[in-house]
A protein has these predicted regions:
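Bacterial Sec-dependent N-terminal signal peptides
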Residues: 1-22
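Zymogen propeptides
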Residues: 19-240
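Extracytoplasmic/secreted cell-surface and envelope-processing proteins
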Residues: 114-119, 150-151, 160, 245-248, ...
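Short alpha-helix capping/helix-loop boundary micro-motifs
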Residues: 238-253
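Loop/turn positions that initiate beta-strands
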Residues: 254-262
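Short, Lys/Arg- and Gly-enriched loop/turn segments at beta-strand edges
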Residues: 265-278
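Short peripheral tails and domain-boundary helices/loops at the edges of structured domains
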Residues: 276-301
Length: 307
């Protein structure tokens, strides 16, 4: 059966339908609101277009989707499956489409730094990136049951092997900081971009990529390199990169053929969220528990009437 993908993770927010000539106040300005269109555009999905007339003229477009529809999927698209790829939305859809999926609604999510999305990114259950806790960035995640989870996720990683014992990885695909331990996957680029200090060791996946749920296994393919930096990332593999002695010493013991196991845990408001399949970041939150939040001053560009 042909499945229908609801692209990205944010467009499912519902809004109150405006009655003809209703009055709205937006950023202190009053508008007359008329509904120009309200029609079905896909399975379980309607498009609403509103016309706001006042001192300024505004046009509002939004979709409302019933995620319980059995042929609607929630899917994150990240460029050309590379964190640093800069593509338009039509290009992203073209590169990620196939005969089994038709993309019909979506929204541009997260903001980009030079190293890709700021927030945690999960695509088809594979971890593309985790956000540093210092960013205070929010994310919306979808689990296997198509339940949405909004907030500031805290992600931890347990790495184990018979050679190193148990270790705690700090992040995935972020620039390495001091006293750090980062996993770099091929979604980050061709190499880690790290400086010469530290230890790095490459591995390839045994049973798929770095999964957002469960344990992923990787096989070490080369001897650890010390004080070299910028190690090449194998296709379909990872590089373990550390520059603190308590991480470096165990990594230096790894041998070719050793198996390392990596298990992530996603925590939201102190509770573990299981079976995450998709996630994308953004800031700030604008709607929570059915209430519009007063967050338009948190980022300077939000005070304007248009992005």
């Amino acid at each position: 059966m042909r499945s229908i993908a609801f692209v990205l993770l944010i467009s499912s927010i519902s809004a109150v339908f405006a009655q003809p000539s209703a009055k709205w106040t937006v950023l202190g300005k009053e508008y007359a609101v008329d509904t120009l269109k309200h029609c079905q555009v896909g399975p379980g999905t309607v498009l609403t277009i509103l016309d706001l007339t006042g001192t300024d003229r505004q046009r509002v477009f939004f979709t409302t989707t019933d995620l319980t529809n059995h042929i609607v999927r929630i899917k994150t698209i990240c460029g050309n499956n590379n964190l640093k790829t800069n593509l338009t939305i039509p290009q992203m859809i073209e590169n990620n489409g196939d005969k089994a999926n038709e993309y019909f609604a979506g929204v541009n999510a997260d903001l980009f730094s030079a190293n890709g999305p700021i927030g945690t990114t999960v695509v088809d259950s594979e971890i593309f990136k985790t956000a540093r806790s210092t960013t205070d960035w929010y994310s919306v995640g979808a689990d296997a049951g198509k339940n949405l989870h909004f907030g500031q996720f805290y992600t931890t990683f347990r790495l184990t092997s018979t050679t190193t014992g148990q270790m705690s990885v700090k992040s995935v695909n972020t620039p390495r900081e001091s006293n750090d331990f980062v996993i770099y996957t091929d979604k980050y680029g061709a190499s880690t971009g790290t400086k010469s200090s530290g230890v790095e060791v490459a591995a390839v996946a045994v049973d798929g990529g770095l999964s957002a749920h469960g344990t992923s296994k990787f096989r070490i393919t080369g001897l650890p390199q010390s004080n070299a930096g910028n190690m090449a990332i194998p296709s379909g593999g990872i590089v373990l990169s550390a520059n603190a002695s308590w991480y470096m010493e165990p990594l230096q013991k790894l041998q070719i053929g050793d198996i390392v196991e990596i298990t992530p845990t996603f925590t939201l408001n102190g509770k573990v969220v299981d079976q995450i399949t998709e996630m994308s970041g953004g800031c700030p939150m604008i709607l929570q528990d059915g209430k519009i939040l007063d967050t338009d001053k948190l980022l300077d560009h939000l005070s304007y009437l248009r992005p």
